Each structure stands twice: as C-alpha cells, then as structure tokens.
C-alpha cells in the first residue's frame, strides 16, 4: 500500500487510497456521462429524420434514450408522447394508451430507465436505440417492450451508433458482458462429461 500511495502521492492509509480512487472513478464517470450526452446530441437530427422516414412508410416507432433532455427533445420534435422518469402514473398510461390505440400516433419516446420494465408497446415492431444502457439486462428489458406476448410482427431493433465514439465502447462492453454471462455448461460440455464418466 505504501508503494501504491507513493506512486499516487497519497497518504498510505487504506482509507486515503480508497478515497483517491473513488475521486478518480467519479471524475471518469462525469467524463463518460458528458461524452454520452454529446454523442446523443450529435445523433438527434439523424434519429428524427430516420423516424419520420419510417413513419412515412407506415411504421410506428419506439425510440429509447437515456438522457432526460434527449427524450424531451425527441418528443417535442416528433410531436410524440413520452415515458420519462418523474411522470405521474396517469401521464405514463396516457402516453402508452395513445401510442397503442391511436393509429395517427406514430412514435413513442421512452427513457430507458423509466420504461424498461412493465410496459407493453406492441403497437410497434421497430425500436430505435439512440443511447444504449451499460448492461445487457437493461438493454434486453428495453427491447422487450415491443418483443413480447401480443406482438404479431417480426421485431427489428435499430441501434444508432457513431463509430469510434463512446457508442462503440458501450456496445463493445455490452457484447463482452453478454458473452461473460452465457452459460458455462453447454450441451457439448455435458456430453463430454458423460463420455468421460464411462
């Protein structure tokens, strides 16, 4: 610990080292959040045009994003209802009902954290992920809003990614985490165990 503390110019006590790394992690988190926001903002125009083109072809779209103001901007630009944190349950239900029952309501904008559980949005079979979450579980919960019982059409998930940006890093992280959570024992592993036991 003393050597590590000397390298970082900190007090050699464990508490001081933890505090030092916590401060570094906090700063990194702030930078990542800023990068995500900048990247999402850069994608807004393309996302709006993409949704309008899809709407012109008769497709209803669910657009998922992370940042509150990104969700609000999309909802305003596309004149669409939204599901966002802090809404009353009545507003959330009204937005959902409008999207599900009104044939002229072509888009629903959702906050990934506010709408990734407990909502059925099967009026659409297309989702645009503008900002991906960090975990495979949250990603799959979000996409499951349109891919669930009651969906009668094939589902397509569109991921809007800027190459060589924080987007690419997030999707690489999602891929790595997904691979790490795959079952360790497969059918071939079971067969090998059975073969070796004879």
Model feature map: region roles:
Residues 1-59, 66-68, 74-76, 177-197:
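Interdomain linker/hinge connecting the two RecA-like lobes of the SF2 helicase core
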Residues 60-64, 72, 79-115:
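Conserved helicase ATPase core of P-loop NTP-dependent helicases/translocases
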Residues 61-62, 98-99, 126-128, 134, ...:
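A generic "structured core" feature
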Residues 64, 110-111, 129-131, 159-161:
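Conserved beta-strand segments of the P-loop GTPase G domain that flank and frequently precede/overlap
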Residues 70-74, 117-120, 138, 169:
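Phosphate- and divalent-cation-binding pockets in alpha/beta enzyme and binding domains
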Residues 84-86, 130-133:
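Short beta->alpha connector loops at strand-helix junctions that form conserved
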Residues 119-132, 155-159:
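A short beta-strand element within the Helicase C-terminal
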Residues 134-198:
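A conserved SF2-helicase RecA2
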